[in-house]
Amino acid sequence: MSATKLTRREQRARAQHFIDTLEGTAFPNSKRIYITGTHPGVRVPMREIQLSPTLIGGSKEQPQYEENEAIPVYDTSGPYGDPQIAINVQQGLAKLRQPWIDARGDTEELTVRSSDYTKARLADDGLDELRFSGVLTPKRAKAGRRVTQLHYARQGIITPEMEFIAIRENMGRERIRSEVLRHQHPGMSFGARLPENITAEFVRDEVAAGRAIIPANINHPESEPMIIGRNFLVKVNANIGNSAVTSSIEEEVEKLVWSTRWGADTVMDLSTGRYIHETREWILRNSPVPIGTVPIYQALEKVNGIAEDLTWEAFRDTLLEQAEQGVDYFTIHAGVLLRYVPMTAKRLTGIVSRGGSIMAKWCLSHHQENFLYQHFREICEICAAYDVSLSLGDGLRPGSIQDANDEAQFAELHTLGELTKIAWEYDVQVMIEGPGHVPMQMIRRNMTEELEHCHEAPFYTLGPLTTDIAPGYDHFTSGIGAAMIGWFGCAMLCYVTPKEHLGLPNKEDVKQGLITYKIAAHAADLAKGHPGAQIRDNAMSKARFEFRWEDQFNLALDPFTARAYHDETLPQESGKVAHFCSMCGPKFCSMKISQEVRDYAATQTIEMGMADMSENFRARGGEIYLRKEEA
């Protein structure tokens, strides 16, 4: 923890400086590469980690080296990871997908905003200083048309987004030639289909079947296409957002950029404080990854935080507002039904979901069914017009391991399965949210129940936390559960930071949560046997055995921390080529000893072979030349 806590003014000033000086930055010894597709404009970014050669022999004066292949890795940082791209947060990112959207000819620009709230914000001159200057003219589907990736997939259309994703998911592994790097243990996939090569047709088929989603609002053309599904790489979401008591627009944009740098595949803006609308505009215009929200939070702000005063009309206006800004997926707590609320009465921790508790309070105060459930078809009509995916929220998720897998949790899950089928009638993409707090032995049931009752729609879980005893370390307690459920088939993991249950995360907390969850997601990919998942591990192990310290740092998920820990005890440059580290020292390094054993064994094999040949020579009489019949 930092020794000096910054004041609010200092935090804002630091964030503003970050934004003002922001430029594309590569990780150490990495470079940005692009792989092109067949569709115009399909140019898929990846990060390529450059490695040093391996010393294989020769003398001190004339050493002999063997080259090591560069390792391509999935990169979520967008333009922020390319030093060749000029960054201007005031202008936003380039609109990568705009030509693809326009070419389909099924959208139209809106001459007037659909949301009354948006109209009021735009008319308020007092917000000019906060407003993003380059606001897009929003689009929506033409009358009678649907513009979702699910609709196109069902029509047999392979979109540029689908080709982009296919290239991205393969992670450039076709470039790797080394058998050492390509070696991979068989996985246990629990029924997942993991083809050796992911094609655009495979992507289309998975989306058409509802097993995967491509969150890609037509009003967020800055986003780089990505996919969430059991048969693809496990993804990670990062939550950001201001509150009524802390954070600013500058800090949230900083956290967005920071999140994409450290591997967030999507980002959820959970803002609940002032200027939600303006904050979200800045985030969307500068985000290369899909953005999700929980619209009920903002709807509640519009009725001064009084849950009983919520109305369908206020919520609908919020959906239109956010859809026309470009939000890629909505978390909707439509499965919290009136009859399920009493099921939570005997729980230790009741209803812990903010959205779930809001809707439960509304249902009880009006003694009516959840208006999100009642108006679900209208929600789907809105989503179909903008290609907003639905993330069906688990408002009754367990908030303690004592409450795990109870009647309320699974009753809601079954309702989410019913709602999934309704959304699919409108060609709306759907994923299902899951818990929560679940001990290890009870985790797998969550996945099997979801697959069965939600028709294999992608599962998206918060952890789950496997124990409740570690406030301040819940990124660890949940990372364990996240790795397990990712292995069982969960498609996306929502990160948990060290501040979970304690406070709003800052920039460093975001990084810690993301690194923890990237580890969990990667461990799940390895366990499933995802093709190519082991390449980076093999490269790291090879570098470690060969004492290529710089390569070890650069192959790490966090090169800076790896280097810092090494340099705490061996800061000299000579320490970067030493055949030991400070843990064991030069005399007891297991890998150095292992190398010596290997060299000794190889020498012994040669000497034994020479001895065998000598014995054979003497047995044949010691003649240099043998008679033809003896040869």
Swiss-Prot record:
Cofactor note: Binds 1 [4Fe-4S] cluster per subunit. The cluster is coordinated with 3 cysteines and an exchangeable S-adenosyl-L-methionine.
Pathway it works in: Cofactor biosynthesis; thiamine diphosphate biosynthesis
Positions with a binding annotation for [4Fe-4S] cluster: 581, 584, 589
Keywords: 4Fe-4S, Iron, Iron-sulfur, Lyase, Metal-binding, S-adenosyl-L-methionine, Thiamine biosynthesis, Zinc
Single GO BP term: thiamine biosynthetic process
Binding residue positions for substrate: 239, 268, 297, 333, 353-355, 394-397, 433, 460
Gene Ontology molecular function terms on file: 4 iron, 4 sulfur cluster binding; carbon-carbon lyase activity; zinc ion binding
Enzyme Commission number(s): 4.1.99.17
Top-level taxon of origin: Bacteria
Keyword Iron-sulfur assigned: yes
Cofactor: [4Fe-4S] cluster
Keyword S-adenosyl-L-methionine part of the UniProt annotation: yes
Catalysed reaction, written as an equation: 5-amino-1-(5-phospho-beta-D-ribosyl)imidazole + S-adenosyl-L-methionine = 4-amino-2-methyl-5-(phosphooxymethyl)pyrimidine + CO + 5'-deoxyadenosine + formate + L-methionine + 3 H(+)
Pfam families per the UniProt record, alphabetical: ThiC-associated (PF13667), ThiC_Rad_SAM (PF01964)
Residues at which Zn(2+) binds: 437, 501
GO cellular component, one term: cytosol
InterPro entries noted in UniProt: ThiC (IPR037509), ThiC-associated_dom (IPR025747), ThiC/Bza_core_dom (IPR038521), ThiC/BzaA/B (IPR002817)
Entry similarity comment: Belongs to the ThiC family.
Function in brief: Catalyzes the synthesis of the hydroxymethylpyrimidine phosphate (HMP-P) moiety of thiamine from aminoimidazole ribotide (AIR) in a radical S-adenosyl-L-methionine (SAM)-dependent reaction.
Subunit structure: Homodimer.
Protein's name in the database: Phosphomethylpyrimidine synthase
Organism: Escherichia coli (strain 55989 / EAEC)
